């Protein structure tokens, strides 16, 4: 059945499973560098024309490492799908499909050594008849899936890093320093956590009224102010500086007014800044560099004149020194101002800015003194506040000590009152306990006295009763001496009566058991056909329910015997005669007899003579004769033993008769055991 189901299911498999396309040889990692137009793929599918090979020349580039490997592998057996250089063909549902018929076969050439180097590129053989197929593109779904997995893994790793940064300080430092946007992400999560834990704090912060700061007047620093990378302007030609034309005159005429405006503007800016921020004077004072005049070009005839110095020698401006003020802001301001002085001193027109620079120095000196005074005032006010704070602290400490002393005194009074009340309670409870113990001791003593009195009364009553009994016994012995003997006789009679009743019950059960056994025997002997005796045997088992011997005897009987019945003696004898005739026919058969042996034995059994009397030999005829004699005598046990000694076909033919005889003997033996047990019960009672 199993083979049939498997065989029937085999034709269904090709219809439900996708047809397997033949494997293809793909290019190795070195062959992938070859141009796409010259790339070729070789199929393993073999057809009737598989013996045809592509013509190759010994000097062509077809004897590369790729074709050597292909030839060596195809000469033994086609490689399986597990090979590293073999890729399964595209499924029919893929974007591009390539039929095996259009793919040229693998050239099976013997491996050639020494023709190609390991690093040389592989070029397939040129075939004029075959056109290169379009290259196969790998499935894009795997790339998208890998990219998606990469993004998911990176996102999970980034989220795990942010989460672990909130737990570990060392990892927090590493994550915020080396991971892009790590610090922003961690700070955002911490801020969200803080807002979730303290929502009211953020509301209060948002509700605060922002007071605008007084930052003073807005200071604008010109683009040309500050230090310059030029040490000095390049000198123009002397002729241009000495000649004063219309442009030069205008430039020199505007220079003093421009210098005055620049100085006044710087002074106003310094004043506004010092008034706006008294303690913070760290801003740079904008000083516009001097405008250098643009010299006009003279005519070509003046170029040949000798050069003369255009500007007198530059006098250096003294630098500002502030040694009394140690404020970093003032020192930075002085440094910036000195840098400005250095730049102006390096210029040719430094003498023009001497006046504004001097005024600026005075203003800066005044500002430094003002800052020192403000700092001193602030220190004095701070010292005053510290002294006031110390005084307030001392006062509050004294007040706190006074309160602590008052609380301590009050607590001591309360503790004393509680102690007194607790002491009174303990004394009261102890007194009550002592009184209770005394009362219990008195009660115990009184109860002991009562018990002694009761014992004495009981003892007196016992003595009185013993005296009365003695007197009564003496009187009874005199008048009622025969009453005790009569009572003893009655008790003995009752005992004998109870014993005889048990004997009667046992005898009754034994008789009932004997009757049940006789009923079973009668049923077996008087039946002409096998008759079941289940009811009779059940009655025997119920009457001897407590007897293990009877139960074992009944259990030894085969269930088929009392359910179907057993044949009688006459039936066994009649059946033996039929079995004996069949056994005589097969008495001459060997164990492995054929049809000829059966026919010969049947013929010879007709001419054999039957034995009479008590033969002593062990042949089949002698055994049958002895068995018939035992059956006529009624000795079924010996008859069964004789028939059991048969061998071969004779024993096989008498097997059923032996089984019936065994069942009959088992039933008879069980009935004999039950009858014997019943007799033993009667003997035990006697």
From Swiss-Prot:
InterPro entries from the UniProt entry: MIC60 (IPR019133)
Domain of life: Eukaryota
Sections of the chain in a coiled coil: 357-495
GO biological process: cristae formation
Transit peptide, start-end: 1-42
Protein name: MICOS complex subunit MIC60
Keywords: Coiled coil, Membrane, Mitochondrion, Mitochondrion inner membrane, Transit peptide, Transmembrane, Transmembrane helix
Bilayer topology annotation: Single-pass membrane protein
GO cellular component entries: MICOS complex
Subcellular compartments: Mitochondrion inner membrane
Membrane topology (Mitochondrial matrix): 43-146
Subunit structure: Component of the mitochondrial contact site and cristae organizing system (MICOS) complex.
Main location: mitochondrion
Mitochondrial intermembrane side: 167-686
Transmembrane helix is among the record's keywords: yes
Family that this chain belongs to: Belongs to the MICOS complex subunit Mic60 family.
Segments traversing the membrane: 147-166
Pfam families cross-referenced by the UniProt entry: Mitofilin
Keyword Transmembrane helix: yes
Stretches the record annotates as Disordered: 66-140, 287-307
Task of the protein: Component of the MICOS complex, a large protein complex of the mitochondrial inner membrane that plays crucial roles in the maintenance of crista junctions, inner membrane architecture, and formation of contact sites to the outer membrane. Plays a role in keeping cristae membranes connected to the inner boundary membrane. Also promotes protein import via the mitochondrial intermembrane space assembly (MIA) pathway.
């Amino acid at each position: 059945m199993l083979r049939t189901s498997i065989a029937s299911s085999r034709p269904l498999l090709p219809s439900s499973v996708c047809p397997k396309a033949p494997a293809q040889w793909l290019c190795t990692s070195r062959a992938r560098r070859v141009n796409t137009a010259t790339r070729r793929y070789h199929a393993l599918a073999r057809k009737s024309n598989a013996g045809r090979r592509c013509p190759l020349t010994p000097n062509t580039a077809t004897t590369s490492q790729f074709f050597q490997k292909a030839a060596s592998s195809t000469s033994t057996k086609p490689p399986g799908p597990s090979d590293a250089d073999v890729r399964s063909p595209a499924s029919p549902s893929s974007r591009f499909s390539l039929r095996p018929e259009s793919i040229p076969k693998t050239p099976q050439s013997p491996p050639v050594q020494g023709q190609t180097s390991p690093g040389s590129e592989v070029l397939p053989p040129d075939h004029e008849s075959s056109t290169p197929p379009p290259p196969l593109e790998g499935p894009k779904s795997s790339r998208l899936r890998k990219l998606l997995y990469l993004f998911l893994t990176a996102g999970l790793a980034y989220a795990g890093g942010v989460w672990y940064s909130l737990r570990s300080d060392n990892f927090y430092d590493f994550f915020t320093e080396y991971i892009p946007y790590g610090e922003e992400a961690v700070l955002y999560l911490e801020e969200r956590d803080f807002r979730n834990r303290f929502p009211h704090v953020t509301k209060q912060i948002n509700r605060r009224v922002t007071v605008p700061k007084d930052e003073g007047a807005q200071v604008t620093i010109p683009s040309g102010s500050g230090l310059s990378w030029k040490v000095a302007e390049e000198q123009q030609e002397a002729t241009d500086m000495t000649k004063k034309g219309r442009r030069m005159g205008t430039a020199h005429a505007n220079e003093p007014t421009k210098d005055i405006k620049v100085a006044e503007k710087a002074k106003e800016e310094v004043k506004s800044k010092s008034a706006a921020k008294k303690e913070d004077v760290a801003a740079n004072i904008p000083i516009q560099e001097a405008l250098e005049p643009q010299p006009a070009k003279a005519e070509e005839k003046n170029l040949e004149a000798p050069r003369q110095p255009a500007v007198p020698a530059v006098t250096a401006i003294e630098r500002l020194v502030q040694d009394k003020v140690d404020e970093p802001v003032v020192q930075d301001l002085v440094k910036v101002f000195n840098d400005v002085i250095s730049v102006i001193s390096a210029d040719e027109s430094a003498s023009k800015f001497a006046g504004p620079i001097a005024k600026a120095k005075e203003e800066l000196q005044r500002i430094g003194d003002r800052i020192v005074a403000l700092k001193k005032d602030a220190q004095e006010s701070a010292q005053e506040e510290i002294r006031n704070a110390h005084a307030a602290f001392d006062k509050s400490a004294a007040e706190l000590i006074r309160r602590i002393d008052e609380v301590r005194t009050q607590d001591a009074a309360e503790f004393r009152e509680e102690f007194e009340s607790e002491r009174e309670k303990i004394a009261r409870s102890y007194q009550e306990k002592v009184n209770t113990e005394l009362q219990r001791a008195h009660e115990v003593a009184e109860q002991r006295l009562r018990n002694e009195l009761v014992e004495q009364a009981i003892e007196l009553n016992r003595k009185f009763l013993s005296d009365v009994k003695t007197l009564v016994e003496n009187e009874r012995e005199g008048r009622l001496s025969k009453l005790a003997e009569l009572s003893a006789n009655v008790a003995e009679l009752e005992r004998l009566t109870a014993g005889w009743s048990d004997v009667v019950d046992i005898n009754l059960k034994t008789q009932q058991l004997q009757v049940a056994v006789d009923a079973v025997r009668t049923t077996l002997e008087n039946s002409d056909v096998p008759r079941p005796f289940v009811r009779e045997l059940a009655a025997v088992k119920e009457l001897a329910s407590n007897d293990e011997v009877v139960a074992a005897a009944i259990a030894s009987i085969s269930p088929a015997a009392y359910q179907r019945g057993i044949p009688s003696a006459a039936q066994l004898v009649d059946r033996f005669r039929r079995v004996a005739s069949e056994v005589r026919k097969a008495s001459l058969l060997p164990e492995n007899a054929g049809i000829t042996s059966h026919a010969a034995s049947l013929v010879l059994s007709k001419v054999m003579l039957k034995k009479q009397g008590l033969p002593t030999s062990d042949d089949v005829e002698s055994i049958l004769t002895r068995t018939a004699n035992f059956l006529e005598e009624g000795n079924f046990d010996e008859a069964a033993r004789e028939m059991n000694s048969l061998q071969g076909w004779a024993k096989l033919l008498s097997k059923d008769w032996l089984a019936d005889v065994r069942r009959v003997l088992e039933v008879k033996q069980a009935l004999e055991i039950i009858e014997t047990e019943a007799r033993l019960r009667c003997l035990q009672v006697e």
